Amino acid sequence: MIESLIALIAAIVGLGIGYLVAKKINDAKYEIFVEQAKAKAKAIEYEAELILKDAKNSILNAELEVKKKYEEKTHKFQKDFNQKFDDLSKKEQKLQQEEEKLKEDKEYLCKSQKHIQNLQSDVDKLKNKYQEKLDDVLKILEHSTGLTQNEAKEIILKKVEENSREQIAHIVRKYEEEAKNEAKRKANFIIAQATSRFAGEFAAERLINVINIKNDELKGRIIGKEGRNVKTLEMVLGVDIIIDDTPGAIIVSCFNLYRRAIATKVIELLVEDGRIQPARIEEIHEKVCKEFDSAILEEGETIVMDLGLNKIHPEIVKLIGKLKYRASYGQNALAHSLEVAHLAGIIAAECGGDENLARRAGILHDIGKALTHDFEGSHVDLGAELCKRYKEHPVVINAIYAHHGHEEATSIESAAVCAADTLSAARPGARREVLEAFLKRVSELEDIAKSKEGIKNAYAINAGREIRVIANAQLVNDDESVLLAKEIAAEIQEKMQYPGEIKVNVIRELRAVEYAK
């Protein structure tokens, strides 16, 4: 019983202690929660103060920005207003000045009109007086000579007319001389201006190219076994290849600049590559021809761009680049055309013409020379037909005809091209007549050979002493080759004059190609 009581008391005491401990713990937690709540409240309050401060700063900045923009707009508006006000004031002042000037002009006109009326009155009086005097003279003449008044009047008028005609002729002759002298002086001034403002480079074209090689052993490889390589080179390239005792040099000779340039490039590539054989020669030749076509087009585009021209047909642009490989009387056709274009532009500008149109006509005036190796006819007709086909400006076509006297120049630009062409071609040292005669002769040789049916190509070599004719093996047999050679030789003998003899060499080669699959 006592133990139970003790246990009960212990339990009650334990419960009391537990309650007190729990209360203490709860009180401590409550205080912690309160402190945490206070801390959070302070943090929220601080954050709110920061937000409020930021908001105030933003509002202040916005107010300042608005104020700044307002001031800027106000300043700009005030500035514009002042500017417009000044403009209006100036216009008003100008109008007042013009009004005053008009008043002065009106007064001057009134005075002039009055003066004219007075002069007219004086003239009428003089006229009447003259008529009276004339009547008196006529009466005296009629009385003394027995002539009627009308007959006497005719004699006097005829005499006056003769005197007047002499005076007029003298005046006309005087002013005509002055006009001629002034025109000559002006023309000399314009030419001096043009030539002083443009100084073109000039280099005479040659008939040979020299290829430098590292050692003379390469000469043997270029010649090949029994001359096989050099014969293939000459046949494919259409040039003379001269391999002599000159150390470290091979000479390529041909009157055609284009063929000579291609031949030079092909041989240089073969020497660099080291594989010199007929198949490789043809492969390199085909590759170089494609490269030259691209280079010619690029050259034409560069020139057109440098001259500031536009809307030129691509085919004409390509032919402009091709002029680089044409020469006339030893003068490079492209260099000559560029010189004419620049000079014509300057002359046209000085005379009040269209400078760009004159440059266009100048660069195209000899465009037909790019076609003379491929088509029959003069370069004037070929160039004019080409420009008509691609709808070039009529002034350009007129300049092409006019610079060789086929037509009269119908514009300032055409006349400028004619003058520039003469300046470029006629200056000392610009052209060589002997070279041109030689080039014409070898061109005629090739044309005669190409005119025959069944001929693929023809090359004049050995300074025109030999014509190498490539026959189409499908159209010409061996017997016909002999006849072709005789026909070509007979036509050359009939149509051309030349010293010595010309060898006609007809080459027929048949290639059969098949592929193993």
Swiss-Prot record:
Function text: Endoribonuclease that initiates mRNA decay.
Protein's cellular compartments: Cell membrane
Descriptive protein name: Ribonuclease Y
Keywords: Cell membrane, Endonuclease, Hydrolase, Membrane, Nuclease, RNA-binding, Transmembrane, Transmembrane helix
Hydrolase found in the keyword field: yes
A Gene Ontology term for the protein's cellular component: plasma membrane
Annotated membrane topology: Single-pass membrane protein
Enzyme Commission no: 3.1.-.-
GO terms, molecular function: RNA binding; RNA endonuclease activity
Lineage, opening ranks: Bacteria, Pseudomonadati, Campylobacterota, Epsilonproteobacteria, Campylobacterales
Spans through the membrane: 1-21
Domain KH: 207-273
Enzyme kind, highest EC tier: hydrolase
Family that this chain belongs to: Belongs to the RNase Y family.
SUPFAM superfamilies in the record: Eukaryotic type KH-domain (KH-domain type I), HD-domain/PDEase-like
Domain HD: 333-426
